[in-house]
């Protein structure tokens, strides 16, 4: 199975600051990658794909980029509601596999 490795595993930022999460694949030819945000007590929510396409209702401060092995999710200006655990998921090859998650804390 393809291993997805996220960095960092946690980060703490103040509102208005940018944030960036990286995801690296153990296989080099990925075409499709999704990002998800899971908030406490909620199901994961789809965020931008690697080609910056956004799921409906995703704010434009979120952007995704990357190809091959290295992918990045960027948040232009973090807001309090962005706190939670972010996961990357490769959907190029079965079985689809997730990164271990990155916990984003938004300082008060």
Curated annotation (Swiss-Prot):
Region of interest: Complementarity-determining-2: 50-56
Region feature (Framework-3): 57-88
GO cellular component: immunoglobulin complex
Keyword terms of this UniProt record: Adaptive immunity, Disulfide bond, Immunity, Immunoglobulin
Region of interest: Framework-2: 35-49
Region (Complementarity-determining-3): 89-97
One GO term of the biological process aspect: adaptive immune response
Region entry Complementarity-determining-1, spans: 24-34
Transmembrane segments: none
Additional observations: Peptides were aligned by homology with human kappa chains.
Listed name of the protein: Ig kappa chain V region GOM
Source organism (scientific name): Canis lupus familiaris (Dog)
